[in-house]
Amino acid sequence: MGQFPEGVDQELARGDAAFTAGNEGMARVCARRAIGLLIDGLWTPASHAAPWPRDTLHKLRRIHEDEAFPIEVRQAAQRLTTKVTQQDTMPFPTDPLADARLVIRHLMNDTA
C-alpha cells in the first residue's frame, strides 16, 4: 500500500486500542483523524480541481458525495460522518477502524 504520512499509523493504533477497550467514540475520532492526516500529507487527486477542505469531517463528506469514488468507500465515509444518537448508538452496525482502513486503502492505491 505504500508508506503513510506521519501520524496515520499512530491514529489507527490509538483507534484500535480504543475500540478494543469499548470506547467506540474515541475509535471514530482516531479513524477520522487518520484519514485527515493521510489526505493532508499525501493525496492530491488530479481528478479534483478544487482544493480539499481543511476540516476532516468536510473531507469525509466530500468523499461521500463524490460519485468518482467506489460506493463502498463513499458508504464508509458516510458512516464515519454519521452522528451518534443521544443514546450513544449508531443507526447501523459499524466498525470505524475498518471503515477508515477501507478509505485509506483506496486513497493509497489511487496515488500509486
Language model regions located:
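Charged alpha-helical initiation segments
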Residues: M1-N23
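Charged, low-complexity interaction regions
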Residues: G22-G25, D88-M90
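Solenoid-repeat scaffolds in large eukaryotic assemblies
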Residues: A27-R28, A34
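Short, conserved alpha-helical segments within structured domains
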Residues: C30-A31, P96
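Long, charged low-complexity segments
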Residues: W43-A112
